[in-house]
Amino acid sequence: MKRYEIRWAALDPASGAEMAKTRPVVIVSLDVLNERLETVTVCPLTSQLHPGWRTRLAVKTGRRRAEIAVDQIRTLSKSRLGRKLGSLSEDEARSLRRLITEMYGE
């Protein structure tokens, strides 16, 4: 499991306004952590587009448009992750790093 891979993840059970169900997520934790820990930090993807939200990053996955929900960042057990769907482009990864830094600091 590598940083910026997109994988299926089972997010249930969820609580309150947390994103739920099985959906794609982007791994955002560092590869050194991904290799050593039993958990990964991810941002879920959603097809519910909100172009004006500064907490979301628009990406194209296959033929569909989606948004990476940086406001829904969370740590999951690796056992919740399924097959790899793809990876972010270098430009998308750079934009995601910038947005995470804007939201959560350096």
Model-derived segments and their meaning:
Residues M1-E106:
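Conserved functional hotspots at enzyme active or ligand-binding sites that engage polyanionic ligands
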